[in-house]
Structure formats: structure tokens, C-alpha cells
Swiss-Prot record:
Name of the encoding gene: drdI
Role played: Catalyzes the isomerization of 5-deoxy-alpha-D-ribose 1-phosphate to 5-deoxy-D-ribulose 1-phosphate, as part of a 5-deoxyribose salvage pathway that recycles this toxic radical SAM enzyme by-product to mainstream metabolites.
Protein name (Swiss-Prot/TrEMBL): 5-deoxyribose 1-phosphate isomerase
Key words of the record: Carbohydrate metabolism, Isomerase
Stored NCBIfam families: eIF-2B_rel (TIGR00524), PRK05720.1 (NF004326), salvage_mtnA (TIGR00512)
InterPro entries: Deoxyribose1P_isomerase_DrdI, IF-2B-related, IF-M1Pi, IF_2B-like_C, Initiation_fac_2B_a/b/d, M1Pi_N, NagB/RpiA_transferase-like
EC primary class: isomerase
Amino acid sequence: MAELLAIKWDDNRDKLILLDQTILPNKIEYIEYDTAEGVYDSIKDMIVRGAPAIGVTAAYGLYFAAKVAPEDKFEGFFKYLKEKSAYLDSSRPTAVNLSWALKVMESKALENKDKDVKEIKSILREEAKRIHEEDIEICKTIGENLITLLKDGVGILTHCNAGQLATSKYGTATSPMYLAKEKGWNFKVYSDETRPRLQGSTLTALELYEAGIDVTTITDNMAAMVMSQGKIDAVIVGCDRIAANGDTANKIGTMGVSILAKYFGIPMYIAAPTPSIDINTKTGEDIPIEERNSEEVTSRFGVWTAPKGVKVYNPGFDVTPHENITAIVTEKGIVYPPFKENLKKLFEK
């Protein structure tokens, strides 16, 4: 079966190649990018999605901006770079990896301010590639840490897509699933379809099915039923931003899943690369929540599913209270409550 990668880099042609996730699972098509404006649109329109993948994509986008910067003196060049960074950062406000990757790129330019601008552009190219490669290693390590919390025969529920399609490879929430498959484990995954954009059915189910993993798609409102039937031993989801106290922003519906998991006594694990942890955001109340187009809710596949003109509330994310989370699993280790103290310790290592 084919391996689906969300992000590819063509080193010879200096182009970013993204899998168009808006047309999955019906078509598998890749789109090439070589401008900051194109990258902005790819993030805004969800050609690429998932916090880690967005961060990697934005890093390449800022390199593309730097590449065509009109300034040859560092002061003017860096001002231009900061403007383009702010522009890219505005594409999707909730995913902290986006601003993290852009800040890393800005810092790399600043570290090399005494060098020729042409050389700095080359350095930024290599930095974007490094961020890309690092994401792959982070995801694999998260999987290695998470699999220690699971056992052969496990039933897993996941929500949205924190898989290979949301990262550079392996995924975060799906990483232990790929590793369990390699170990020959017999396990089952239930994938919430994740309305309104159906990332669970169109993306997670697709990539796991293509990988030969036993996956069953369920509607969002079936989660309580499958939990009550004893089919779920663990809930594993990704995240877009984790506050300093452990409150976690993830795709809309995750909070409801966490409440159900707590009720049924099922562990709730957050798979989180450390760039998704925002120590400067105190609680979930401080996380900006993106509101999306009303037509995502009122129409599907070109057909209206609600009255035209009806009011729509369509937040892209909700915040899972830290009290509902069993553990946050990162590439640096497994973090248990109390999260406020232990997340801080994670960054002191």
C-alpha cells in the first residue's frame, strides 16, 4: 500500500510539495509551492493541516519570502522577514507550532546578522529543512513513549487526524499505532469521523487503512456507545496548543470525548510535540479559538444540509480541561498531573 506523506521537499528544484488534503480520500494529488503567498493559502485553506505540519510548512514559506527579499542590508532584510512572518502567522491562529516555527526561523536569521544577506538566505533554507527532519524524529519518539502505556490487543479511540497526514511522518497520536503494527500487535482503532470537516473519516481512516491497520470509522455521536461496550481501552488524540496548566486545544469535539472517557474510566492521552506546549499561555481560556466558514456546517459535497441563511456557530477547536487528561506524552517523556509543575520541569531538562 502507498505511503501518504503530507509534506515533501524537492531539494533540486527548491519546491515544497504538499498533499491536497481537501480532496481526500477521493483523489490523491500533490501541489507544488515556491512562494510565501502560496504557502499562506495552503495553510488557510487547509490543503495542509495539523499543527506540526503547519509549522513545517510555514518554515518553508518564510524561506520562500526570504529568498525574494528585495533588501541587501540586514536591517531592511530582517524587517521584511518579520512582516512576512506576521503574515504567515495570521493564516491559522490556534496552532502554536505555526508561530513557533516562524520564531525559530527569525531567531536563526538574527543569529547570523553579521553575515551577508545572501548567505543568510541559504542558512534559512537549511533551517527549514532541519525543522522538517526534526519533526519526523519527534513523532517517532512520541510513539515510542506512548506505546509503553499500551498493550497487545488494545482498543484505541482517536479523534480528528493527528496522524502522518498532520505531521512530516508517523503522526503524533498515530505514531504508536504504526509502531504497534511493526511489532505485530493485534489491536483495533476506532476513528471518530470528526465533523464538520470529517478529518477522522477522510484522513485518519484513510492513512491507517492504507497502512494495513485495523480501523473502524464511527460517527462522533457513537463514541459513548463504543466506550460503554468495552471496546475502548485508551483514547489518544493530538493537540494544537497546550497551556501551561495542561488545558489542551484540539479539534472541536475533543472535549466531549474527554468527558466520556473520564466517565467510563478510560485513560485520555495527549500526544504532543514540545513545540505544541505554550508555557506562556496560562490556561485554556487564553488560547485563541479559530472560527471557520459557516458553509462547513450547512453544506456537504455541494448539497445544502441546513436551511440557507440559518445562523451557524463553527469554532474549529475546543479546549479539554486538564482534569480530564491522564497524561501528556512528548518526545521528552511522559508528563502526568500536576501538569502546571511537571510541564514546567519538562522544559528545564
